[in-house]
A protein has these predicted regions:
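Absolute protein N-terminus
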Residues: 1-2, 75
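Short amphipathic
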Residues: 3-10
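Amphipathic, hydrophobic secondary-structure cores in small proteins
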Residues: 12-57
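C-terminal structural segments of small proteins and small subunits
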Residues: 48-75
């Protein structure tokens, strides 16, 4: 999937990945896509909570090599 901005939060635990994702999305224009890479197992739950609060969209989530990858579209 194509993305505009990438944020690698590998090695960081809650709440840091979600705070960084929220800040990154706030700086983006509507329709742009943020790719977030995380090693925090709770990140999936956190990304869903973030998009529910902000109105942004979780387009896709995958995992590979113990990393969780999320694609979020800015509302």
């Amino acid at each position: 999937m194509q993305f505009t901005v990438e944020l690698d939060t590998s090695g960081l635990l809650c709440p840091i990945p979600i705070i960084k994702a929220k800040r990154a999305l706030a700086a983006m224009a509507g329709g742009q896509v943020l790719r977030v890479v995380s090693t925090d197992p709770g990140a999936a739950r956190d990304m869903l909570a973030l998009t529910a609060k902000t109105g942004d969209t979780l387009l896709e989530q995958t995992s590979e090599n113990k990393k969780f990858i999320f694609y979020l579209r800015k509302a």
